[in-house]
Amino acid sequence: MPFIVKIKKQLALYELTVDLETEAGILAVIGGSGSGKSMTLKCIAGIETPDSGFISLNGRVLYDSSKKINLPPQKRNVGYLFQEYALFPTMTAAENISIVMKQKNPVQVQKWLEEYGLGDYADSYPDHLSGGQKQRLAMIRMLAAEPQCILLDEPFSALDEHIKRKMEREVMEMLHDFDKPILFVSHNQEEVYRLADRIGSMENGRFSPIREKRAFFAEPQTVGQAKLVGCNNISEIDWISEDRVYAKDWNLSLRVPFTE
């Protein structure tokens, strides 16, 4: 069943307006800093409350302003990977995982730790782990809770460049068999192109219609989208004939060929 988010929330600079529907696979939400990406995830997770709207996951209503339904985060069954990982600092790696499990299983916890290269760190605290190890632990903990969808909030932004690609591959391997919706927030167009199946953009709190990623990059629909995919040479134009335009910012006349 689809994952549906139709919400509005008044923020200081704009009104957040999100209307999306997605199913299994990775949907990227790309946008600049302050565009509303992270706030959208927080509303879905129940950390923030929209002013109005509706959120349902797998046929289960998480939020409905008209019916005064607003499930707390722990009852939404949504996995959320924060930029800062949000590990419990006074718990060991093994304890960070077992605390979210519906049925405690120390053998399974150790199996996960070993599978993802943390077998020797079961009794270590987060402060004693590297950035990459913390991210792996946060991913294991998130999956151990058996979520019905996953929210990834700039998951690689805190990592050094030389390990970022390695962690991308590791995260994708960990999510390979997760056949439920994944919302992946990023401002990095290369990251989005490598990892996502479909893309929607955020501009001043407004979420654009979802498109297949190749179409999104090949034919951006707004100036904002064009900048997000790396197009920097943008100019206002005036049509001067059927097949010619005048680019105001470049002081150039250009031919625009038409194709049937």
Would you name each region that the model predicts?
Residues 83, 92-224:
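ABC ATPase nucleotide-binding domains
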Residues 62-79, 220:
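ABC ATPase NBD coupling module
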Residues 32-36:
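Walker A (P-loop) phosphate-binding loop of ABC-type ATPase nucleotide-binding domains
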Residues 38-41, 137:
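ABC ATPase nucleotide-binding domain helices that frame the ATP-binding cleft
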Residues 221-260:
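ATPase nucleotide-binding modules
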Residues 53-65:
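Conserved ABC transporter NBD signature motif
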Residues 45:
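Helix-to-loop junction immediately C-terminal to a conserved catalytic motif
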